[in-house]
């Protein structure tokens, strides 16, 4: 997977920390503290042992005696153990060699020579995460699992893959690039470029924001590895040879150039022994020549320009330009300076109280900040970028002037103390909040700094940095202003990069690709052509052969826990509103949710619900204007959010609950403040500021438009499903292409008064305690206080309570659970007369890849066949569709899955094909109906399904399934038993009965470039 350099990797405020989950007599944390500096363990030497109480862990730093490999172990009482190995990969061209290598090492190794052990292990393990990332200057291979045996299995596969890969030429052709006949079996069909990474990168550069971010980095840091595209520039990829790939592996994938990281409660000695025996003992030290030198600073600012494709869904078609100024900062190994600059970046541009928000967003010059804006600590020297997307070309000079003026204003005025406190409170919340994938977050958080020989342990001492930051401010009130003066005002290493759409952009890309193709073809001899044809057949034969994977380790179905852990909840009520209390070790946090149905909302207002949800917490309430409200939310909570929720019934596909969910969290001490903020939103929301609404509408429309090229498969699945169930129909309105186009129309309106007037009407129906139920997760000690505060909150909002008739008369009541009491019911809408119908929709978009989906209406969650369809989807993906769609078809991804709403969905992602992929979906059904699978295939599919079913759940989210969907632990256990019981006969039966042609109604949708054959086919609706 190509990971673009962005703040996701190192930005502190993106890391959700996780508190101690379990108490033990002798915990992993305590045991690790007993290691001593200089201690030898399996040819590793302990260099440092550090308690990190902020994160409830002990950090043990080691180095390997023979190779010098660096090792960090984070011992913590968390059963979701993680391993990661990182190599510094610094390419000097844009052929994508580190990215193609990342794909190819996972295609088979010395001990595990079968093709594609990585994808095969997804189905032979209970992993909670398995992947690999190529960043600008490193490649990382992480996995996590809760099962100790599984950890050892995966560690063996990962170590062998990275250090002893086969790197077969056939795998290079498949994963990287190749010249091949369009139809490999027909030598008269034209020669074309194929390859998984080749198509993936074409898809990446279909996304204007990704394109811009890539150029920004290349041009800001032009001296060394950051001047090239590590993921591969599509037209440079065909310059890479197999020999160059093997050479890059030999020079970069060595323990002397590696950083190992392990996390969790498994014993460190065990990891070290296995790593030493299976990999390290076979190597000697080398001197890797992979360091990135500092960029030579410029003596004057530079400007540059880049072109992109037009955006058919842009909120304002005449405002499609992007302009940013990017400043090169200091070395990321200076952890405290980077901590300060990361906070400074947030103060400068996060939220409506920040100076750049006021200066750039509120005047409505652009639709939003560029997604490249902010602090980026993923390269050796960090950078800060500020600028806009969705702006007019004429405003270029204005924006430059505003940025310069705002920097001057910050130097003159600084920041309010309350803004700084709000930001430090955010850090405190994130240190308390518990995520389920903390090991992975930690591995990503330290990756860039450690990659450049910084101290990863220092980076984890967050409280120390906060204290030092406070001290610096105390000693020098102009501390931050002086940083702004130094890094922004006086910094000559700054780049101004503009981007504008070119109507012929995709056409020019296609022409350039054709030109590159012809260059390659023209130099081919008749021998070469014959060779290409034969190699194409050879690859196809290998792809079509069932692989013997018996060399790979695997868990057995008997390794899966037969019984789920029970989550106790206490039902109650506050002021007549049902409340679910769930006592959990939340580490001093309180989590609040409320579900409110929208059954009484008039039909004409329904399409506005997502807009209402996105603006209601951002327009002010009570005595607070929107700026004061934002400040208060930051100071007292982990955020307030409102989002639409459509929940299918577990027994009937024509029943569903429609509503909104309110979510927030806070530190225990701020509980009254959090509920006061909600009370103000219920009692006195502000709907009087049209200018504020316009800003929010533009940002929302831009975000939706930007998201399509990244999440195209989700939009395709949502659209394909819309005509199959009432739930899916409403889902398309709320979160599909219908909503994207609706928001574009609103963004184009010159007068939003009519929209503004609708918001109070919607609020009366949505913020009605009569339709509400609440859920709270907190520590047992705090729960009495929580109950009292909820009671007070419901009392405060009682004036909004009104019994309103549902718009649709057919309402079915379902109890929330056996012990919830008569009052606690969910009011579901019944559409018994809904008629599913066949529909094929094509969205023509300026992309150069497709997103394809087909959906079939099947059965609800509690139906006896639901479990079989879950197993079938996973098995079909691993054993048939992966080979057809990715290996042969060249798409980045694809598969099939069973959804909770009773829909069986096929999909492909960044796919060079369109209707051919629909044929592959059908082929998958025929493969299953013919029973062309083994008991081993079924067992592997079960392991894969259970790894998702048993994924860790954070204390903040325990009991949510029951609260939202009415799915009790008993129902989960029954589903579990049905999954265990699935047989070959069941799978053949459900494939024929539900997925066979003509058996059930299906819907199809494709998002992709212009397609002449579909346009001429009357069975398709072209949008």
From Swiss-Prot:
PTM annotation: A disulfide bond locks the enzyme in the closed conformation preventing substrate entry into the catalytic chamber.
- Example GO BP: proteolysis
Q: Name one GO cellular component term.
A: mitochondrial matrix
Q: Which UniProt keywords apply?
A: Disulfide bond, Hydrolase, Metal-binding, Metalloprotease, Mitochondrion, Protease, Transit peptide, Zinc
Cofactor: how and how many bound: Binds 1 zinc ion per subunit.
Query: According to the UniProt record, what class of enzyme is this?
Result: hydrolase
What is the first-listed, main subcellular location in coarse terms? mitochondrion
Q: Does the keyword Nucleus apply?
A: no
Spell out the subcellular localization from the entry: Mitochondrion matrix
So which cofactors does this thing need? Zn(2+)
Q: Where is the transit peptide?
A: 1-62
Assembly, in brief, is: Monomer and homodimer; homodimerization is induced by binding of the substrate.
As for what it does, the entry says:
Metalloendopeptidase of the mitochondrial matrix that functions in peptide cleavage and degradation rather than in protein processing. Has an ATP-independent activity. Specifically cleaves peptides in the range of 5 to 65 residues. Shows a preference for cleavage after small polar residues and before basic residues, but without any positional preference. Degrades the transit peptides of mitochondrial proteins after their cleavage. Also degrades other unstructured peptides.
**PANTHER family from the xrefs?**
PRESEQUENCE PROTEASE, PRESEQUENCE PROTEASE, MITOCHONDRIAL
List the protein's name.
Answer: Presequence protease, mitochondrial
Q: Which organism is it from?
A: Danio rerio
From the broadest rank down, the organism's phylogenetic lineage runs: Eukaryota, Metazoa, Chordata, Craniata, Vertebrata
């Amino acid at each position: 997977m190509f990971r673009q350099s962005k703040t996701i990797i190192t930005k502190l405020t993106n890391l959700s920390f996780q508190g101690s989950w379990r108490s033990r007599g002798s915990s992993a944390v305590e045991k690790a503290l007993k290691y001593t500096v200089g201690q030898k363990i399996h040819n590793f030497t302990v260099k440092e042992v550090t308690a990190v109480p902020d994160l409830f862990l002990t950090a043990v730093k080691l180095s390997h005696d023979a190779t010098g490999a660096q090792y960090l172990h984070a011992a913590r009482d968390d059963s979701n153990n993680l391993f990661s190995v990182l190599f510094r990969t610094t390419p000097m061209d844009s052929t994508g060699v580190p990215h193609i290598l990342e794909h190819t090492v996972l295609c088979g190794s010395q001990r595990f020579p079968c093709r594609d052990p990585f994808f095969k292990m997804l189905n032979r393990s209970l992993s909670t995460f398995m992947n690999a990332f190529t960043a600008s200057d490193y490649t990382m291979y992480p996995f996590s699992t809760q099962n100790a045996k599984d950890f050892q299995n995966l560690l063996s596969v990962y170590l062998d893959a990275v250090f002893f890969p086969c790197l077969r030429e056939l795998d290079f052709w498949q994963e990287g690039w190749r010249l091949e006949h369009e139809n490999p079996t027909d030598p008269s069909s034209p020669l074309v470029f194929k390859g998984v990474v080749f198509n993936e990168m074409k898809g990446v550069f279909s996304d204007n924001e990704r394109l811009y971010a890539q150029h920004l980095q290349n041009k800001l840091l032009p001296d060394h590895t950051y001047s090239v595209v590590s993921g591969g520039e599509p037209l440079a990829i065909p310059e890479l040879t197999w020999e160059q790939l093997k050479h890059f592996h030999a020079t970069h994938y060595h323990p002397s150039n590696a950083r190992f990281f392990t996390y969790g409660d498994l014993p460190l000695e065990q990891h070290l022994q296995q790593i030493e025996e299976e990999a390290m003992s076979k190597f000697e030290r080398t001197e890797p020549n992979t360091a990135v030198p500092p960029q030579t600073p410029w003596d004057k600012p530079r400007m540059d320009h880049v072109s992109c494709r037009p955006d058919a869904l842009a909120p304002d078609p005449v405002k499609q330009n992007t302009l940013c100024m990017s400043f090169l900062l200091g070395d990321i190994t200076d952890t405290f300076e980077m901590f300060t600059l990361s906070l400074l970046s947030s103060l400068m541009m996060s939220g409506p109280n920040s100076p750049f928000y006021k200066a750039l967003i509120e005047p409505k010059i652009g639709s939003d900040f560029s997604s490249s804006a902010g602090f980026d600590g993923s390269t050796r020297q960090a950078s800060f970028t500020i600028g806009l997307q969705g702006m007019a070309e004429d405003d270029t000079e204005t924006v430059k002037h505003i940025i310069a003026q705002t920097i001057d204003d910050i130097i003159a005025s600084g920041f309010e103390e309350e803004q700084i406190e709000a930001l430090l409170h955010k850090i405190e919340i994130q240190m308390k909040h518990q995520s389920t994938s903390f090991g992975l977050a930690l591995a990503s958080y330290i990756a860039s700094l450690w990659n450049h020989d910084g101290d990863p342990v220092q980076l984890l001492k967050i409280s120390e940095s906060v204290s030092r930051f406070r001290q610096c401010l105390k000693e020098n009130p102009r501390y931050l202003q002086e940083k702004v003066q130094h890094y922004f005002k006086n910094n000559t290493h700054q780049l101004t990069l503009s981007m504008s759409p070119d109507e012929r952009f995709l056409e020019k890309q296609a022409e350039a690709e054709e030109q590159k193709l012809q260059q390659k073809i023209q130099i081919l001899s008749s021998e070469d052509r014959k060779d290409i044809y034969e190699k194409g057949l050879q690859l196809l034969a290998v792809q079509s052969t069932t692989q013997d994977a018996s060399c790979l380790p695997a868990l057995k179905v008997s390794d899966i826990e037969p019984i789920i852990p029970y989550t106790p909840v206490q039902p109650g009520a506050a002021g007549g509103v049902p409340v679910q209390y769930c006592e959990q070790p939340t580490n001093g946090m309180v989590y609040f949710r409320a579900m409110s149905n929208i059954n009484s909302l008039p039909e004409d207002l329904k399409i506005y619900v997502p807009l209402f949800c996105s603006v209601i917490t951002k327009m002010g309430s009570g005595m607070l204007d929107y700026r004061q409200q934002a400040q208060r939310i930051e100071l007292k909570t982990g955020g307030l959010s409102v989002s639409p929720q459509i929940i299918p019934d577990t027994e009937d596909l024509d029943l569903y609950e429609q509503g909104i969910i309110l979510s927030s969290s806070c530190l225990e001490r701020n509980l009254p403040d959090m509920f006061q903020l909600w009370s103000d939103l219920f009692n006195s929301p502000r709907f009087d500021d049209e200018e504020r609404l316009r800003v929010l509408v533009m940002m929302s429309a831009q975000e939706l438009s930007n998201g399509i090229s990244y999440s195209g498969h989700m939009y395709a699945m949502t659209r394909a499903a819309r005509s199959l169930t009432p739930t899916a129909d409403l889902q398309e309105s709320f979160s599909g292409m219908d909503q994207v186009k609706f928001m574009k129309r609103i963004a184009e309106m010159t007068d939003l008064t009519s929209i503004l007037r609708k918001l109070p009407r919607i609020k009366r129906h949505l913020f009605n305690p009569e339709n509400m139920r609440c859920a709270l997760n907190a520590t047992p000690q705090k729960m009495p206080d929580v109950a009292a505060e909820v009671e007070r909150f419901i009392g405060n909002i009682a004036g909004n309570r009104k019994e309103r008739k549902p718009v649709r008369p057919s309402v079915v009541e379902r109890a929330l659970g056996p012990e919830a009491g008569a009052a606690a019911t969910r009011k579901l809408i019944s559409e018994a007369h809904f008629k599913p119908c066949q529909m094929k929709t094509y969205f023509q978009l300026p992309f150069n890849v497709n997103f394809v989906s087909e959906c079939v209406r099947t059965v609800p969650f509690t139906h006896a066949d639901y479990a079989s369809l879950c197993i079938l989807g996973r098995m079909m993906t691993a054993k048939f569709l992966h080979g057809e769609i990715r290996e042969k078809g060249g798409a980045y991804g694809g598969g099939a899955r069973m959804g909770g709403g009773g829909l069986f969905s096929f999909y492909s992602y960044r796919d060079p094909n369109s209707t051919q992929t629909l044929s592959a979906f059908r082929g998958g059904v025929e493969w299953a109906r013919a029973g062309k699978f083994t008991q081993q295939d079924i067992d592997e599919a079960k392991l894969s399904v259970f790894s998702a079913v048993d994924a860790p759940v954070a204390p903040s989210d325990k009991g949510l399934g029951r609260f939202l969907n009415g799915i009790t632990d008993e129902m989960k256990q029954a589903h579990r038993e049905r999954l265990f019981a699935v047989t070959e006969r069941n799978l053949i039966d459900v494939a024929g009965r539900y997925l066979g042609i003509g058996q059930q109604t299906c819907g199809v949708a494709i998002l992709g470039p212009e397609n002449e054959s579909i346009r001429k086919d009357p069975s398709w609706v072209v949008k």
